[in-house]
Design a protein with these regions (language model features):
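Basic, helix-initiating cap at the start of DNA-binding domains
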Residues: 1-39
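Short hydrophobic/aromatic patch on the recognition helix
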Residues: 40-51
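Amphipathic alpha-helical packing segments from all-alpha helical-bundle domains
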Residues: 89, 114-161
Length: 198
């Protein structure tokens, strides 16, 4: 990394860690530009040199929480030898981690952002490549996809290639999984369903 990138990463890390502390103390709804700047020891205006808006900063702070999921995936996939089992295990791992921190995962995958999420995720992993861990090719492709629908589709496509799912059913199956997941995640956030039952 060149000096400019190192400096950018360092300053962004101050803001991300400050936002992460606020998430732990007050939840995502407690994050404001002023609170983050004060905690990081900077002027509020400085944040806008590194982040487009508050949602961009919240996304990056939330991405730190997805690291646990990314690092847990290899354990879930240890003895998996086909695409269908991989599909099931990735969803199992994803649900386990996302239902523990539903607001974080909602902020990442269902946020209302200015740019395409893939640009933000690409930028994040370019600055913090260690956050993604070491993953099999199929899984790293899925992790780098820009939205939850495309992430799921990467797994479903592998099931189609191996003959577990008919090509004409692929999009429907993926959409059903995504919609069911989003509905359950919202119920967990609203405390309408217990995390253990989800």
């Amino acid at each position: 990394m060149d000096y400019k990138t190192i400096r950018k990463r360092r300053v962004m890390t101050y803001f991300i860690e400050a936002a992460d502390e606020i998430i732990k103390e007050d939840g995502i709804s407690g994050i404001t530009i002023r609170k983050v700047a004060d905690k990081a020891g900077f002027n509020s205006a400085t944040i806008y040199n590194y982040f487009e808006n508050l949602d961009h900063l919240i996304l990056f702070a939330a991405m730190k929480h997805i690291k646990e999921y990314a690092l847990a995936l290899p354990k879930y996939l240890y003895n998996v030898d086909n695409a269908l089992d991989r599909f099931i295990k990735v969803w199992e791992c994803f649900c386990y981690h996302s239902f523990k921190e539903p607001e974080i995962y909602y902020a990442i995958f269902f946020a209302n952002l200015d740019k395409d999420l893939s640009e933000y995720i690409g930028e994040y992993y370019k600055l913090f490549p260690e956050e993604i861990g070491v993953q099999p090719k199929e899984v790293s492709t899925m992790l780098l996809r820009h939205n939850i629908y495309d992430r799921g589709m990467a797994l479903v496509d592998e099931c189609v290639k191996e003959g577990f799912i008919r090509e004409e059913d692929a999009e429907t199956i993926n959409e059903m999984c995504t919609l069911i997941y989003e509905g359950i995640l919202q119920k967990v956030i609203k405390n309408k369903i217990d995390t253990d039952k989800a």
